[in-house]
């Protein structure tokens, strides 16, 4: 193998290592879709909140396949239920919200809202699963 081949092989291996190790440390995000609307949500830290400690819930992207979205007129709500079905939060949603998960268990985060398509608003709802430790 010539010098060019060794450099090319080294660059490929280095790129693969960066991809693998970089992906392991990247913050977690979840994306779900409903009625042509994709919503990406993140819960700090790394989608693994610690019960009893403040976390941030971030709606990082709302992308409709048709129409437009704005937090100003979406009438968005976030409902968080624990594994027993007990609702621990039900309020108007913002792009970033602080929340303390009360105990170590699984939670369902239901994000609802509406997008404008033409002159009408169309509702959507997406569900995310999170486990607090």
Residue ranges of predicted features:
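Bacterial N-terminal signal peptides
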Residues: 11-20
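N-terminal secretory signal peptides that target proteins for export/translocation
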Residues: 1-5
